[in-house]
Amino acid sequence: YTIKRQGDSYNDTDIRSEYASATALRGNLKADNISKYIPVKAGLILSSNTNYIYPDDITEALFTRLLGILFASSYDKNVFIENVMRYPDVNKEIAGRLYKSAMDMITRTVPQGAESKDNGAFSFGSLCEHIKTKEVPLSRIKRALVRITLGLDKKHMEKYANEPYIRVLGFDKKGQEYLSYIRKTVEVPLITKIADYKEMLLDDIHAANIYNMIVAGKYGVKEFGDFVRGPVRV
């Protein structure tokens, strides 16, 4: 049986009770107003890392990607639609709206409904709102745009379904002993050294590089790439 949700509703954007929605927590993160609604340890982790990025921070990466697809499509609407429909969650209607938005971006024309609240320009969030319809929920639009930004089309998704792997992010002394044991029995690659599995992890590395570039541009902080960052030992 299902457990009845307590506190705020799933999509609530405001915090009204001691059990806030994830949507509200993310929305209030900027204002540093969530410490009393999350576990103490989680609060300590958040307070020790202030290099946050938000959906609108990937706007430039998204539109650079869309511009690349336009170029590859010779700016032809039908070819563009065919190309972006290769990505999961993108149907013909979404693809058509994306084409118009991408062309408007080139001519610096912001379609009604896609203005940013900050400066009237395009943003990831405002574009999602512009593209969504009654039949296509906002969550689907966001997934589609992130996949386009990362270049993860349907072929990539099929590859991950058929080629699973385990990437170890961290372990303690006991975990190290366990890893030594399961390495002999596990049927999929158990990855602790990224350089040994470069081809398999290219998409992970690409996504991490986009993140690192955004952080560097926003905060002037250079993040270490996945090739030089090993599992965390605790």
What annotation goes with each model-predicted range?
Residues Y1-V234:
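Active-site cores that bind ATP or allylic diphosphates and position pyrophosphate for catalysis
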